[in-house]
Amino acid sequence: MIDRRQFVRYGLGAMAATSLSRFAHADDEDKKVFLDYTQKQLDDAYTQTVWAPNAKQVIDGYARTSEEVRQKLPPTTYSYGSKASENLDVFAPPGARNLPIMVFIHGGAWQMLSKDDSSGPAPTFVGAGAIYIAINFDNMPGNTLPGMVDQCRRALAWVGANARRFGGDPERVYVSGHSSGGHLTAVMLTTDWKAHGAPAQLLKGGVVMSGMGDLAPVVLSVRGKYVTLSPAQVIEFSPMKQLDKANCPALVAWGTLESPEFKRQNRELADALAGRARLAGVFRVRGANHFEVVNELNRPDSELSRATLALMNI
């Protein structure tokens, strides 16, 4: 796992930017590699620090806010698997019983962050009479994208099967996530849960924040240096290609200061969900860059928080 300082310094996903011979930049700098993007333009589109100069401060704030929340609202940690990293933090009101559950999947370009950086939204949900769960999983390079998907699926299946242990309602499990966690959230929302040993209707809704529905441009970008997938896996783990499995409503949110490519990714995912009558709402967070969008859930009075709680019928 790379540390936060390295991650921000090298552009949150552009760790290999000094070794891009595979993309043959020098051969034809004007060649379009995806839509109307040249290679450099596509690399920049998936390098978040190009669009968010305050990235380090915001990311550091995730950990700081999370620590403050845990001091005031200590969670209970459970294991959902056999590995030390396979655990999750449960934040619940005192005397919780049969409450709706929001599970959060952290971002970090599939390379960094953890449940310990993801406690910020807990007061919003606990204060509304719900349970908030931040899940942990292994990041790259020690893990693969298929491995992350497997861990997230097992974590959600565990939550559904064990909800009553911590006062939750197994019939009211929701999922949310930001950035690469937004992608993983969309994968969870397009999972055939019955094929994975869980109830077909395990999830009742979700919130995708600044995610990615199509991995094709991701693997063509600088991130393709570490997000290594076969053509079949690109399709398998692209939610846009698996929408026939979506069986619950979802909110989609992104910031107005995000890269045009991330706006496109989220807008097209929202449009596709709408086409299948699975879109619960769209939120363009005004004045927010990629990293700031998720902080909307830290404020109970934000439009996104209110819509999320309404999605959960609370």
Please give the residue ranges for each predicted region.
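Short amphipathic alpha-helix adjacent to the substrate-entry channel of hydrolases
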Residues: D116-I133
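C-terminal catalytic histidine-bearing segment of alpha/beta-hydrolase fold enzymes
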Residues: R267, R276-I314
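Mobile cap/lid helix-loop segments that gate and shape the active-site cleft of serine hydrolases
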Residues: G211-Q242
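N-terminal cap/lid segment of alpha/beta-hydrolase-fold proteins
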Residues: T49-G95
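Primarily recognizes the serine-hydrolase "nucleophile elbow" in alpha/beta-hydrolase
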Residues: G160-L220
